[in-house]
Amino acid sequence: MHFMTALRAAWQQRDSLLCVGLDPDPARFPAHLQGRPDAIFEFCAAIVDATADLVCSFKPQIAYFAARRAEDQLEALIDHIHAHHPGVPVILDAKRGDIGSTAEQYAVEAFERFKADAITVNPYMGRDSVDPYLAYPDKGVILLCRTSNPGGSDLQFLDVGGEKLYERVARLVAEDWNASGNCGLVVGATFPAEIARVRALTGEMPLLVPGIGAQGGDIEATVKAGRTAAGGGLMINSSRAILYAGKGEDFAAAARAAALQTRDAINAYR
C-alpha cells in the first residue's frame, strides 16, 4: 500500500493525528526488562500493542537501536507492527543525507532491509541526494524543513533570494520533488508560525511535527496552524512523554493512557 494511502486511512479510521516515536533507552526501562537481550524489542512491542489503535503512525529512531547493536530488534519490531497492526505506517527516523550512490544504499536499508513505509531525509545536499528515496514511489520521503531544535534557526532562517531557507525547502519539495505524491516535511511544534507558513506553501502535504510533550510544543497552536481543511495533514509526534509515562510492569498501560490523553487533546482542535 502507498504510504500516503495508508496514512490517510489511519487518520480517518483511527481518528488520530498522533505519531508515537519509538526512542528506546534501556536505562529507563522497567526493572523486569533490565538486562534482557531482547529488552528493546519487548519494550517497544509492548508500547506498540498498547497504543496502535490510537495512532496514525509509529516512528522508530534508528540511532537508539544501532547504538546498542539492536538493528535486528528494529527489523523484528517493524515486522511485528506490519503483522499485528496492518495499516499503521512506520516512519524510519534516520535523517539520512549523502551523495547519490550512498543514498541508494540507505534507501535499500530503509525500504528493503527494515521494510519501513517512510523515512526522514536531510535535503541539505540537494535533489540528487534525495532521488534514490524518491525512486520508491510507494514509500514516504519526509524531508527536514523547520526543525524543532533551537539551533535550527542557524541555517533554516538564512535569507536565500528573498525567502528563508526553510521556505525554499518547502517550496522545492512541493513544486519540484513531489511528482509521485510521496513527500512530506518535518516542521517542529515549537514554531507554530512556521507550521502555518509551510502549510500555506505546500497545500495538503503531510507534515511530521515533533516537539510536543517533552520539548514543550503547544498542541492547540500546532493543530490550528497545520491542519488541512479536512482536519488532517499532520503526524504530531510524541516520544518520551508516552514511552516513559510509567516506570513499573504496567508501563504499557501508562503509555496507553498518555497516548489517549494526547490524541484527545489533539482532536479537540481539529
UniProtKB/Swiss-Prot annotation:
Signal peptide extent: none
Pathway recorded for this protein: Pyrimidine metabolism; UMP biosynthesis via de novo pathway; UMP from orotate: step 2/2
Underlying gene: pyrF
Active site (UniProt): K95
Family: Belongs to the OMP decarboxylase family. Type 2 subfamily.
Alphabetic keyword roster: Decarboxylase, Lyase, Pyrimidine biosynthesis
GO biological process: 'de novo' pyrimidine nucleobase biosynthetic process; 'de novo' UMP biosynthetic process
Lineage: Bacteria, Pseudomonadati, Pseudomonadota, Betaproteobacteria, Rhodocyclales
Catalyzed reactions per annotation: orotidine 5'-phosphate + H(+) = UMP + CO2
PANTHER family for this protein: OROTIDINE 5'-PHOSPHATE DECARBOXYLASE
EC supergroup of this enzyme: lyase
Molecular function terms, GO-annotated: orotidine-5'-phosphate decarboxylase activity
InterPro entries per the UniProt record, alphabetical: Aldolase_TIM, OMPdecase_AS, OMPdecase_type-2, OMPdeCOase_dom, RibuloseP-bd_barrel
EC numbers on record: 4.1.1.23
Keyword match Lyase: yes
Name of the protein in question: Orotidine 5'-phosphate decarboxylase
